[in-house]
């Protein structure tokens, strides 16, 4: 869902972005990017800085580390700070670059946030970039797209030889895709009202300007075929995954694609047979594992999944096993929102050290399921006390689809349907968030004050 290309469309070459710092309304802002210039295709990027000459390099000395690897980052980004912005120009409605110039760049200028802008060209481009990037140059990585691009960034960081240090680089989510669940959750944690589109982007940009950091959890997933995947948001199987993946063809509608996809899927409601097991929070606390299980002894690329045993073995005796049956959906959720208007986990901002497990058993009527999803906008779906809907806070789970039926969606990205298990790692990643001590820095103004045009015109770009 809105990864590097927002699908499999041809990507846009990484190009120098015209239009100066603080000049979102310059005559160059509508310049097209799809040029054939070899230098642009080689990956020229845009640089901006808080008030100064157009395109001037940042004042930060290159190569200076901005965090202590032994302690990780502090609770606040420095002022001024330098960030790397990874932006998918084709995600969602295809307006991310325009939104960056008009909504994000002016606020960053006021807040002394310098940036370098890189446009992704294809699926997994962001993953490749962060895998090879010299992270010590940046105070934070800013991801402007949907949830899929953040998924790429996190997995790219976890694939680095220095993953233990790399994953502690602060991350920031700026919504510009069709799926913006992580940004909506951070907006909720900051105490803002539930909003969408440009209003959500404004709120998340203000969070970056305030520089506050908060730790969030990471979900480690392992499949029967040996894949290890890391998730920032969710794993879905059944109805939610079907809607997420099958509505990709409507992604130009933005988040309306999910409403349309839900209605279409309700017409022909599917059920999937499988087995589910999970480790409830209370059992994890009372019966913590004494040692690392065998599956981690030869896998040191990532944190130890101490609650998991190999998929070939039965789950431990203190786990809860749901008998094999037909499910409409299974959803494992780390955060409050599944979309900007889907308040799926109103039980609390974040369950400390846990994740939300929902499943809906077969037998639920289409009308009831529709009512649940409509009530989810305000987080009131649990008030229905629907006997087919089950919710449990867990720290680990195992899900085994029968005969590989159905689709998995991890952070909105399709994953092969096979047996999978996962464990949450609490407070593992630092995110720009509204949770923390108030910043002494002045609040950026929105709309930003008008600024005099730069005297030096922006550089010419071959189109």
Protein language model features and the residues they cover:
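ATP/NTP phosphate-donor binding region
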Residues: 1-144, 151, 155-158, 165, ...
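Catalytic core of DAGKc-family lipid kinases
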Residues: 2, 96, 118-122, 128, ...
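ATP/nucleoside-binding phosphotransfer catalytic cores, i.e., glycine-rich phosphate-binding loops
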Residues: 2-7, 23-48, 52-53, 70, ...
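Core residues of folded domains in eukaryotic genome-function proteins
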Residues: 29, 79-83, 111-114, 136-140, ...
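Short coil/turn segments at secondary-structure boundaries
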Residues: 64-66, 95-102, 130-131, 154-157, ...
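Eukaryotic intrinsically disordered and solvent-exposed regulatory patches
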Residues: 67-73, 127-129, 138, 160, ...
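Structural signal for hydrophobic/aromatic residues that build the beta-strand cores
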Residues: 83-88, 126, 141-142, 147-149, ...
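Eukaryotic basic, amphipathic alpha-helical target segments in cytosolic regions
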Residues: 108-116, 134-138, 149, 161, ...
């Amino acid at each position: 869902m809105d990864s590097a290309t927002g699908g499999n469309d041809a990507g846009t070459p990484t190009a120098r972005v015209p239009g100066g710092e603080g000049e979102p309304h310059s005559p160059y802002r509508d310049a097209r990017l799809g040029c054939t210039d070899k230098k642009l295709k080689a990956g020229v990027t845009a640089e901006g800085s808080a008030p100064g000459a157009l395109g001037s390099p940042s004042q930060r000395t290159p190569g200076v580390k901005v965090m202590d690897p032994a302690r990780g980052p502090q609770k606040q980004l420095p002022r001024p700070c330098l960030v790397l912005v990874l932006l998918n120009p084709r995600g969602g409605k295809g307006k991310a670059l325009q939104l960056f110039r008009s909504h994000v760049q002016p606020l960053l200028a006021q807040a002394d946030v310098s940036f370098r802008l890189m446009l992704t060209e294809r699926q997994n481009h962001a993953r490749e970039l962060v895998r090879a990037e010299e992270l010590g140059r940046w105070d934070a990585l800013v991801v402007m797209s949907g949830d899929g691009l953040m998924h790429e960034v996190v997995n790219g960081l976890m694939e680095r030889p220095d993953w233990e240090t790399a994953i502690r680089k602060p991350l920031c989510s700026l919504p510009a895709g069709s799926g913006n669940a992580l940004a909506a959750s951070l907006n909720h944690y900051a105490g803002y009202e539930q909003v969408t589109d440009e209003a959500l982007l404004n709120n998340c940009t203000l969070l970056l300007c305030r520089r506050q950091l908060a730790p969030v959890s990471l979900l480690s997933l392992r499949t029967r075929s040996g894949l290890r995947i890391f998730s920032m948001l969710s794993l879905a199987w059944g109805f939610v995954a079907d809607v997420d993946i099958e509505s990709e063809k409507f992604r130009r509608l933005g988040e309306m694609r999910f409403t349309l996809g839900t209605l279409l899927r309700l017409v022909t409601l599917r059920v999937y047979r499988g087995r589910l097991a999970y480790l409830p929070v209370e059992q994890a606390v009372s019966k913590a594992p004494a040692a690392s299980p065998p599956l981690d002894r030869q896998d040191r690329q990532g944190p130890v999944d101490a609650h998991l045993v190999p998929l070939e073995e039965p789950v431990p005796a203190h786990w809860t096993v749901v008998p094999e049956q037909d499910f409409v959906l299974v959803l494992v959720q780390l955060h409050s929102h599944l979309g900007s208007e889907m308040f799926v986990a109103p039980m609390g901002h974040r369950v400390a050290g846990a994740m939300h497990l929902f499943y809906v058993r077969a037998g639920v009527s289409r009308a009831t399921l529709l009512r649940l999803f409509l009530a989810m906008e305000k987080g009131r779906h649990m008030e229905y006390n629907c006997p087919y809907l089950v919710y449990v806070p867990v720290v680990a789970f195992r899900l085994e689809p029968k005969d590989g039926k159905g689709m998995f969606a991890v952070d909105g990205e399709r994953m092969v349907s096979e047996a999978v298990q996962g464990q949450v790692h609490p407070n593992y990643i630092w995110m720009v968030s509204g949770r923390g001590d108030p910043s002494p820095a002045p609040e950026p103004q929105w709309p930003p004050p008008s600024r005099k045009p730069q005297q030096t015109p922006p550089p010419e770009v071959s189109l």
